UniProtKB/Swiss-Prot annotation:
Statement: the UniProt record of this protein carries the keyword Transport: no
Protein name as catalogued: Ribonuclease PH
Originating organism: Rickettsia rickettsii (strain Sheila Smith)
Gene transcribed to yield this protein: rph
Keywords from the UniProt entry: Nucleotidyltransferase, RNA-binding, rRNA processing, Transferase, tRNA processing, tRNA-binding
Catalytic activity: tRNA(n+1) + phosphate = tRNA(n) + a ribonucleoside 5'-diphosphate
Keyword Transferase among UniProt keywords: yes
InterPro entries: ExoRNase_PH_dom1, ExoRNase_PH_dom2, ExoRNase_PH_dom2_sf, PNPase/RNase_PH_dom_sf, Ribosomal_Su5_D2-typ_SF, RNase_PH, RNase_PH_bac-type, RNase_PH_CS
E.C. numbers: 2.7.7.56
NCBIfam families: RNasePH (TIGR01966)
């Protein structure tokens, strides 16, 4: 039995608040248990130098954790003068994932910047950021099409992400911080709307894991992602 009382295949309570930020083209506050991430999507009429003159766009991402988001205050990376390796890894993951579900050729020479700010961290911040960022991106595209900045919808697919791991010998879904910090295996799965995989990250923290255990995690994660896709659709169709 998990300390939270959840079943092995049970997600934490989830909510998606649409458009909490009034200035961004799209924004979403995602809450998965006690992990809360503010996600926004902003459009700029510039592209990276390597894309200039090619009439196609780009999506990039930035990720950060507020100082009070964890039990011990995190120093602002701006004050330190450089980003940490974890921050760079996560924002690259988010950017890669978002580029998999959008046709950047249909953006024209525009760049959409995804910003993910962790307000409260209790495990699974990167997966929450990806799931919330899709909603923010969807709203941004909707806004740009309404303003006729974009003529064609460039979105190809939904995207959602969830963590899965092996904790005390049991395969479990959506690890919170206590589970994550003591897990035998910690993995993250990023899915497209049709169930195909976009990215998998898996690490054995103590002992190697078997192919059978990996497939069990994949199955559990796929079921969790299906629930996330359903929630995304519900909130977006209702907005």
């Amino acid at each position: 039995m998990r300390q939270s009382g959840r079943k092995s295949n049970q997600l934490r309570p989830i909510s998606l608040e649409l458009s909490p930020l009034i200035n961004a083209e799209g924004s979403c506050l995602i809450k998965i248990g006690n992990t809360h991430v503010m996600c926004s999507a902003t459009c700029e009429t510039t592209v990276p130098p390597f894309l200039r003159g090619q009439n196609q766009g780009w999506i990039t991402a930035e990720y950060g954790m507020l100082p009070g988001s964890t039990s011990q205050r995190i120093k602002r990376e701006a004050a330190l003068g450089q980003q940490g390796g974890r921050t760079q890894e996560i924002q690259r993951l988010i950017g890669r994932a978002m580029r998999c579900v959008i046709d950047v050729r249909k953006l024209g020479e525009r760049q959409i910047i995804i910003d993910c700010d962790v307000i409260n961290a209790d495990g699974g911040t990167r997966t929450a950021a990806i799931t919330g960022s899709y909603v923010a991106l969807h709203l941004a595209i909707r806004s740009l099409m309404k303003k006729r900045v974009l003529k064609v919808n460039p979105l190809i697919s939904q995207i959602a992400a969830i963590s899965c791991g092996i904790y005390k010998g049991e395969v479990i879904l959506d690890l919170d911080y206590l589970e994550d910090s003591d897990a035998d295996v910690d993995s993250n799965f990023v899915f497209a709307g049709n169930g195909n995989l976009i990215e998998v990250q898996g690490t054995a923290e103590k002992n190697p894991f078997s192919e059978e255990q990996f497939l069990a995690m994949l199955k559990l994660a796929k079921g969790g992602a299906a629930e996330l896709f359903k929630l995304q659709n519900q909130v977006l169709l209702g907005s």
